[in-house]
Amino acid sequence: MPSGFQQIGSEDGEPPQQRVTGTLVLAVFSAVLGSLQFGYNIGVINAPQKVIEQSYNATWLGRQGPGGPDSIPQGTLTTLWALSVAIFSVGGMISSFLIGIISQWLGRKRAMLANNVLAVLGGALMGLANAAASYEILILGRFLIGAYSGLTSGLVPMYVGEIAPTHLRGALGTLNQLAIVIGILVAQVLGLESMLGTATLWPLLLAITVLPALLQLLLLPFCPESPRYLYIIRNLEGPARKSLKRLTGWADVSDALAELKDEKRKLERERPLSLLQLLGSRTHRQPLIIAVVLQLSQQLSGINAVFYYSTSIFELAGVEQPAYATIGAGVVNTVFTLVSVLLVERAGRRTLHLLGLAGMCGCAILMTVALLLLERVPSMSYVSIVAIFGFVAFFEIGPGPIPWFIVAELFSQGPRPAAMAVAGFSNWTCNFIVGMGFQYVADAMGPYVFLLFAVLLLGFFIFTFLRVPETRGRTFDQISATFRRTPSLLEQEVKPSTELEYLGPDEND
């Protein structure tokens, strides 16, 4: 009997449709609740910027005492705000190095459960910051929720990738990004002044992140652990068999279990690499460079600058209701993530990434032109909105969801944990740089700031075109062959791969 974890060809050569069980749906939904929180905390800090800055001003004045200045120095306020935004990424940078250790020690499911302690604590601190008259507490809360998000950014794709059926591997993997953008959109809507973006309710707006954390704590115990973790890492055949049965809906999972046994045998022959060994390995240097550059192409594209400071950008463009325009960008973000879900297994990772980079570069140039002409041509404010919407749409077609797919597929089991740590650290470091530095760069460059991103996007496009292989439909042996300078393997007939190969071993390097 075919298992839900295999892709067994039918008589006409077409792969069969595999069952999507209720357990699989519950497990994926429960996992991506973490990604929803990740996105929420990216977007939530934008809309209430003015009222939070007013709170910072009141706190600062209260500490000066009578006879002090009548307002906080602008430089101090800018620094406090930039730190409030960027400390989120510092937490992510630090925790991203712990993904491999925690996922191996606790398992995928229990690691996600334990991670919610950071979410609850961070949300509580942010919610209490105003009452405590302490911007330090808010910044600490942002740090903790960033640490939560750093772990989530690795744990969720790992878990979903290991439980996904083959024919849905790409689509279910992209749901991680979809949950992130939905979280951003929810934060933007709730951040409106007519909702929670007021001087009295903004602490509640920041604290709401506790709710999906509690929901995940409630649902995850009913979900199975990754069968790959149970058998290959923990050597627990009975629990792995039970997990496979729940996920696939089949009574006989012997084929899937045999697949796990074969993978375990290969893993025993492949030496895991430490971080230092990976960095010093000539064999893995090229795929590691590709993995890092693709992460840079995501974060240095300018997308986080748009979401962190979108309200300010729309105000600069002369939009009368910038908060609503920001929500419009969030809707576009969500819609085009759905488009990526539909296209990722059809068009290919490399093609979508190139399309996204090219489109974002064009929109960045258009945005610059619109901002420069705004004073002479007021209608340019509408052009700037179109440019931002297009910028967001092209991001979600390619640079948003694609880089993590490539990282997972470029490396076999031995170097993969270290490679994901390097890629994750690169991603979060750039996130921090943009969050901390964009406001200063924007003040210095004015309307020309997005030309800087256009130049970077062009460079990433050229690199992707010249160096990044297409990985869709190819086995890890074929992908690895491109880095051994034997491209002839890529011309061979592509054999079906399985979702367990998504994070499984391929060869003994």
Swiss-Prot record:
Residues 1-24, 103-111, 164-171, 223-287, 345-353, 406-417, 467-509 are cytoplasmic. The keyword Cell membrane applies. One of its GO terms (molecular function) is D-glucose uniporter activity. Glycans are attached at N57. Keywords: Cell membrane, Cytoplasm, Glycoprotein, Lipoprotein, Membrane, Palmitate, Phosphoprotein, Sugar transport, Transmembrane, Transmembrane helix, Transport, Ubl conjugation. A motif (Dileucine internalization motif) lies at residues 489-490. The dileucine internalization motif is critical for intracellular sequestration. This is Solute carrier family 2, facilitated glucose transporter member 4. It comes from Rattus norvegicus (Rat).
